[in-house]
Amino acid sequence: AVSVDCSEYPKPACTLEHRPLCGSDNKTYGNKCNFCNAVVESNGTLTLSHFGKC
């Protein structure tokens, strides 16, 4: 399984860096920061499906 380290999150602001990730909710996140913030908000229920757009 693929995973990302979200231990440094959440962060108050994310850059506009474009490196899409696909979440287990079938949503495409613009970059790791956006994805990790969502993971923290979901209390860990959101996971990484794969790198790239969904």
UniProtKB/Swiss-Prot annotation:
Cellular component GO terms held in the UniProt record: extracellular space
What coarse category fits the chief subcellular location reported for this protein? secreted
Keyword Cell division assigned = no
One GO molecular function term?
Answer: serine-type endopeptidase inhibitor activity
Annotated site (Reactive bond 3), which positions? L16, E17
The organism's place on the tree of life at top rank: Eukaryota
**Keywords per UniProt:** Disulfide bond, Glycoprotein, Protease inhibitor, Repeat, Secreted, Serine protease inhibitor
Please give the PROSITE patterns that the UniProt record associates with this protein: KAZAL_1 (PS00282), KAZAL_2 (PS51465)
InterPro entries xrefs: Bifunctional_prot_inhibitor (IPR051597), Kazal_dom (IPR002350), Kazal_dom_sf (IPR036058), Prot_inh_Kazal-m (IPR001239)
Q: What is this protein called?
A: Ovomucoid
State the organism of origin.
Pavo muticus (Green peafowl)
